[in-house]
């Protein structure tokens, strides 16, 4: 019952937003369709669907066509790509178990997988931060900087630590007499 009410509210909100911002809604729908197509095709380059999610985030951040448009697009693009790749990093094990698409699967057997993903995420967040710093943000600037410079890393650290612990536990169960 509760989820039915929630979904009806979402549909109503979506229709209202689509009516208010038809061009944005069209761009977002096209990007979602591209993500869906790339995922169904098993795209091995994680940046392809991540780029589409960056387009979605750009449209969310972009309120009007003014002098800050390009900077907002750069901020949103990097942030969206970061979110998509971080989500893939977090979901990799479960996606593998359930046979679902994950854009990082092709890279996951690399011995430096965690560092590889971390470097991608650092590069994306550096792009996001550089673009953000060009914006004339006054309200909540410190809060936003805190999120950009440290808050976004909380989830990555949690995921990486969980992966490292699992790897260590698996290694210990395979070699019970060995100390680490």
Which residues are covered by each model-predicted region?
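A structural signal for well-ordered alpha-helices, especially hydrophobic packing surfaces
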Residues: 61, 83-86, 132
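Accessory, usually C-terminal, subdomains that scaffold auxiliary metal cofactors
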Residues: 92-158
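Generic structural concept
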Residues: 32, 76-80, 122-125, 129
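Single conserved hydrophobic/aromatic residue that forms the stacking wall/gate
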Residues: 1-6, 10-11
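Alpha-helical phosphate/pyrophosphate-handling elements in metalloenzyme active cores
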Residues: 40-79
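Acidic, carboxylate-rich catalytic segments that either coordinate divalent cations
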Residues: 150-180
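Active-site alpha-helical segments that house and flank conserved acidic catalytic motifs
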Residues: 7-8, 70-94
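Nucleotide and nucleotide-moiety/phosphate-recognizing core
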Residues: 11, 20-21
